[in-house]
Regions:
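Structural recognition of the beta-strand scaffold that forms the well-ordered cores
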Residues: 67-69, 92-96, 117-122, 157-160, ...
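Loop/helix-junction capping segments adjacent to catalytic residues or to phosphate/diphosphate-binding pockets
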Residues: 75-76, 101-105, 167, 195-196, ...
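Alpha-helical scaffold elements lining the catalytic groove of polysaccharide deacetylases
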Residues: 126-151, 165-216
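Active-site beta->alpha N-cap acidic-glycine motif
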Residues: 37-132, 136-150, 236-239, 255
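Short low-complexity, flexible loop/linker segments enriched in glycine and/or proline
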Residues: 108-110, 134-136, 199-202, 262-266
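Active-site beta-loop-alpha junctions enriched in small/polar residues
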Residues: 73, 97-99, 123, 162-164, ...
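N-terminal pre-catalytic segment of deacetylase/amide-hydrolase enzymes
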Residues: 1-69, 74-87, 207, 239, ...
Length: 269
């Protein structure tokens, strides 16, 4: 049933038509979403995401510092080792024995010229000799220090004791070394390349390096200057490079990572 109503002017009107006219008469608010503003919004969002990504990468790189260290050299194979490190743009520190330095002076000079760090590993690498008395470790390190300085002009305070500073480096031995400014460097990743003479040592290093890095610690990797290590080293260097690890050298002004006795040190005699 159609109901007719009387308008204020006295004319009859259809309410549905009146409503439609009222709707048509209402102004519609328009939003200006132009293409230029939309593009600007997208660009800003991209820039914010890029900045977040760059910050994350910077933090990631900062926390992924690795120290490669090589003991017992130099050797007839050290030149190949340096070639490999340079090929992968890796830095490293070499703890060397006095007699070996004298036998391979050119490669030691090359280390220095190419920005590698050099340190002392003693003279004898014989536990019964280097740990025979409180001043014996100091004597060997002073001799090694002089050999390096006379050859290269570099005054290094970096030392690594044969077999590490535990258990044979007693407290009195440590005091003598400290008084002469030596920095005793041990390690927190033992490659065991002296026993695992194949790529098993690489797998071990990769696992322990990743674990330490995730924990926010910088891996100090113990390796040896010998043919078996050099043979499988490319696998390790390639992994470090692809996973954005940054290698650095040890320096005289760093606080060293040193094993603490905690009741474990004793005299060998």
């Amino acid at each position: 049933m159609l109901v007719k109503v009387k308008s204020a002017e006295g004319y009859e009107a259809n309410p549905s038509i009146a409503m439609a006219q009222s709707i048509q008469a209402s102004p519609v608010e328009k939003h200006d979403f132009t293409s230029s503003k939309l593009n600007e919004s997208i660009q800003i969002k991209k820039e914010i995401e890029l900045e977040k990504q760059q910050q994350a990468e910077a933090l990631d790189n900062e926390s992924k510092i690795v120290y490669l260290t090589f003991d017992d050299g130099p050797s007839p194979f050290t030149g190949q080792l340096l070639d490999l490190l340079n090929q992968y743009h890796m830095e490293a520190t070499f703890f060397m024995l006095g007699p070996n330095i004298k036998n391979h002076p050119d490669v030691v000079q090359r280390m220095v010229d190419e920005g590698f760090a050099v340190g002392m590993h003693g003279i004898t690498h014989n536990a019964k000799q280097i740990y025979q008395s409180p001043k014996a470790p100091l004597s060997e390190m002073l001799e090694g220090q002089k050999i390096i300085e006379d050859l290269t002009g570099v005054h290094s305070n970096l030392v690594r004791l044969p077999y590490g500073s535990v258990p044979y480096l007693t407290m009195d031995m440590r005091v003598y070394l400290d008084k002469h400014g030596f920095k005793i460097w041990d390690w927190n990743v033992d490659s065991e390349d002296w026993a695992l003479k194949d790529n098993r040592f690489v797998n071990k290093v990769i696992q322990e390096t990743d674990n330490l890095s995730r924990a926010g610690e910088s891996p100090i990797i113990l390796l040896h200057d010998k043919p078996e290590t050099i043979q499988y080293l490319p696998k390790l260097l390639n992994y470090l490079q692809k996973n954005k690890y940054q290698t650095k050298v040890l320096t005289n002004d760093q606080t060293p990572y040193t094993f603490q006795c905690n009741g474990r040190c004793y005299s060998i005699h």
